[in-house]
Each structure stands twice: as structure tokens, then as C-alpha cells.
């Protein structure tokens, strides 16, 4: 899989831009604040209809314009497929093969991407919400039904929280409704938990040997999905019974707080090196090796799930890695994955992958191919 071309209309600082790409490595070279990251963000939006930088759709639309538009053509399974995403003040519209998609969950998954940016280094050491968002993005693009389930979960969670808030305020409401919402909540929660736990298990299978190699055989990586339920066995009904029992035990506490206290929206992923928690005890080098291993594992996992390698986006991350990790990253993707790199300079990066790259010079919203 690779992105053949992209057209941007009124997206960020690009009023009218058309580019054709190499199926191997493409480098966006330029000073800071010229629009390099905006180009990678456009590719990410074309793939996931979401950004790694903002959740406010208005940020994408050029000042005093009505809408932003991205068009791309991808080569996938021997076919050339046009994608289109329009962003207005009211929301998003998406098309595949010129056919409008009723839901974004039907659109996502046509173009698979893996992004590695400086903020992804906080995937290991940052707050649990960062890791939950990572799971949602990665599972969602491989299993679009997951996005539908996630949307349903968020809807029921919101309803349940509203009801708990009413009970907290001593309003006269039917107490049976809380039990009904809790049952619905548990069904969807276990669905998400199962998909997340399965993903983590597969991710570890790829990430562990990569980490072992980067650490020169000195470190063993383990990844654990820390769920609200006890993940004994493989029977979701057992998990659901455990969740319902726990929710019943904290029912009064939830009413007192007016909020749902357990569920996938509170779950986390934990990383261990040689048995020690990386978040708490890992050095900066170990945390970076873990993040790099996870990103490289994503590439292989997406290939396993979809039959195609994803597009890799490296947003100014090479400068955050030392020479050894740079070399391992570029060596792992060489000749295998279409890659987009943003950087202020390629000097000091001595690797054949970049020397053979197609370079685009970016300055004040203009892009020139070398």
C-alpha cells in the first residue's frame, strides 16, 4: 500500500497544493513553522479522519474559508483507489471511489498509517489517556467495527453518567433504569476490552523481539493490558459477570460521585522491561527503545491483519533518536514501507534510506520537489 498523490484545498496553510509521491521514501525538508507537519497531518487525516495534534475540526480550515478538502489516491491490492475528505464548520464528509460514506467508521481503514512523532515518546511515560487513544486509533483502522463499538460505548457512558448525576442530586428517577444502562454498558465494555486485550497480545508478539534486538539482547519487553475486569480465560461472559459484580460493589460510590468509575475509559496499558515497570523505573533510553519497538511492531501487525504494509509518517522524530536507534529504524523500513519524513536537516543522518529519498522543500506554505 502507498499514497500515490494528494491534493489539498484550504487545509491549514495550504490553499491549493497538488503533490505526487515516491512509493519509497519522501522527505519534507524546511525550517520550523513552514508547514511540514501540516503535510503529514493531511496524510493522517486522509487515513483516519483524525489528527494527532487537535480534536477541533475548525483548526484545519484556512482562515476565512468555508471548508478544507483533502483528496488522495492510494495503490492497494493492485488497484488505484481515490479517497476524499472534506471538513466544514458542521463536520466531515468522506468518499471512497467517489461514493459518499454514511459513517466515518466505513471510511477509516482504506489507508493504513503509522505515525511516529516526538509526542509518541510519551506513549510509554505519559498519562493513561494517551495509551487509550493509541489503542483506539490503531485498532480502529484495522477493525472499523471497533470504531462503531467505541462510539456506542461513549454514548452509553454519557447516558449512564447523566443518570448517575441525577441520582447524586436526589432527583426523582426510576432506579431500574440504572440497572438497564449498566447491563448495556457491560456488553459494549467487554467487547472493547476483548479487542484491546487481543491487540496488546499480538503487539507484544511483534514488539518483544524488536526490542530484544535493539537492546542488543539485554532486555525483554512485556506488555500488559490493565483492564477493569479480571482477564481470566477467554470467555467474555465470565469477564462480563466480573465487571457487573464490581460495578454493583461500587454502585453507591458512583452515585455519590455522579460518574462511572470503571470501564475501558479508565483502563491502561503497562510496559515491563526485565520485569520492571518502564513507566516508573525505565530510563529515558529504555522508554525510547520501547516506543520505537511498538511503532515498528505496528507496521508488521497491520501487515498481518490487512495483507498490506501501512504508510509510515516520521514527524521530526529522527532528531529525537540517537544514531543507533535512527539506524535501526531506517534499516527496518528500508525497501518495505512507504515513508514520509519531516526534518529541518538531513545532515548527520548517515543512512542510505534518506540518501535515495525524494525530497520536497517546504517554505511558507509552498512545496517544491527537488
From Swiss-Prot:
Q: What does this protein do?
A: The RecF protein is involved in DNA metabolism; it is required for DNA replication and normal SOS inducibility. RecF binds preferentially to single-stranded, linear DNA. It also seems to bind ATP.
Q: Which organism is it from?
A: Listeria monocytogenes serotype 4a (strain HCC23)
**Cellular component per GO, a single term:** cytoplasm
Q: What's the short name of a Pfam family annotated to this entry?
A: SMC_N
Biological process (GO) annotations?
Answer: DNA replication; DNA synthesis involved in DNA repair; double-strand break repair; SOS response
Q: Which PROSITE patterns match?
A: RECF_1, RECF_2
Q: Which GO terms describe its molecular function?
A: ATP binding; single-stranded DNA binding
> Which keywords appear in this protein's UniProt record, sorted alphabetically?
ATP-binding, Cytoplasm, DNA damage, DNA repair, DNA replication, DNA-binding, Nucleotide-binding, SOS response
Where, by residue number, does ATP bind?
30-37
Q: What is its main location?
A: cytoplasm
Q: Where in the cell is it found?
A: Cytoplasm
- Name of the gene encoding the protein in the UniProt record: recF
The protein here is known as: DNA replication and repair protein RecF
Family listed: Belongs to the RecF family.
Amino acid at each position: 500500500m502507498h499514497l500515490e498523490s494528494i491534493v489539498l484545498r484550504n487545509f491549514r496553510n495550504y490553499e491549493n497544493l497538488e503533490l505526487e509521491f515516491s512509493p519509497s521514501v519522501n522527505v519534507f525538508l524546511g525550517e520550523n513553522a513552514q508547514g511540514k507537519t501540516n503535510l503529514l497531518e493531511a496524510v493522517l487525516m486522509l487515513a483516519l479522519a483524525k489528527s494527532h495534534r487537535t480534536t477541533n475540526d475548525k483548526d484545519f480550515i484556512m482562515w476565512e474559508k468555508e471548508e478544507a478538502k483533502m483528496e488522495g489516491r492510494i495503490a492497494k491490492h493492485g488497484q488505484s483507489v481515490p479517497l476524499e475528505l472534506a471538513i466544514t464548520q458542521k463536520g466531515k464528509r468522506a468518499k471512497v471511489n467517489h461514493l459518499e460514506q454514511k459513517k466515518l467508521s466505513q471510511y477509516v481503514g482504506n489507508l493504513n498509517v503509522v505515525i511516529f512523532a516526538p509526542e509518541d515518546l510519551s506513549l510509554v511515560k505519559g498519562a493513561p489517556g494517551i495509551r487509550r487513544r493509541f489503542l483506539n486509533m490503531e485498532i480502529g483502522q484495522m477493525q472499523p467495527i471497533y470504531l462503531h463499538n467505541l462510539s456506542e460505548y461513549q454514548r452509553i457512558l454519557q447516558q449512564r453518567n447523566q443518570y448517575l448525576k441525577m441520582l447524586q442530586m436526589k432527583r426523582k428517577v426510576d432506579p431500574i433504569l440504572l440497572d438497564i444502562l449498566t447491563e448495556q454498558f457491560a456488553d459494549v465494555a467487554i467487547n472493547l476490552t476483548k479487542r484491546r486485550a487481543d491487540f496488546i497480545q499480538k503487539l507484544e508478539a511483534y514488539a518483544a523481539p524488536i526490542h530484544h534486538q535493539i537492546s542488543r539482547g539485554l532486555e525483554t519487553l512485556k506488555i500488559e493490558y490493565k483492564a477493569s475486569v479480571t482477564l481470566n480465560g477467554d470467555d467474555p461472559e465470565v469477564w462480563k459477570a466480573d465487571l457487573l459484580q464490581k460495578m454493583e460493589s461500587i454502585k453507591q460510590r458512583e452515585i455519590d460521585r455522579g460518574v462511572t468509575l470503571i470501564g475501558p475509559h479508565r483502563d491502561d496499558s503497562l510496559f515491563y522491561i526485565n520485569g520492571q515497570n518502564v513507566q516508573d523505573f525505565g530510563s529515558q533510553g529504555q522508554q525510547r527503545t520501547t516506543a520505537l519497538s511498538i511503532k515498528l511492531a505496528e507496521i508488521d501487525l497491520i501487515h498481518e491483519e490487512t495483507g498490506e504494509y501501512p504508510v509510515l509518517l516520521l514527524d521530526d522524530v529522527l532528531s529525537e533518536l540517537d544514531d543507533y536507534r535512527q539506524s535501526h529504524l531506517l534499516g527496518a523500513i528500508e525497501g518495505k514501507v512507504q515513508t514520509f519524513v519531516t526534518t529541518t536537516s538531513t545532515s548527520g543522518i548517515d543512512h542510505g534510506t534518506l540518501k535515495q529519498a525524494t525530497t520536497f522543500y517546504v517554505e511558507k506554505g509552498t512545496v517544491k520537489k527537488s
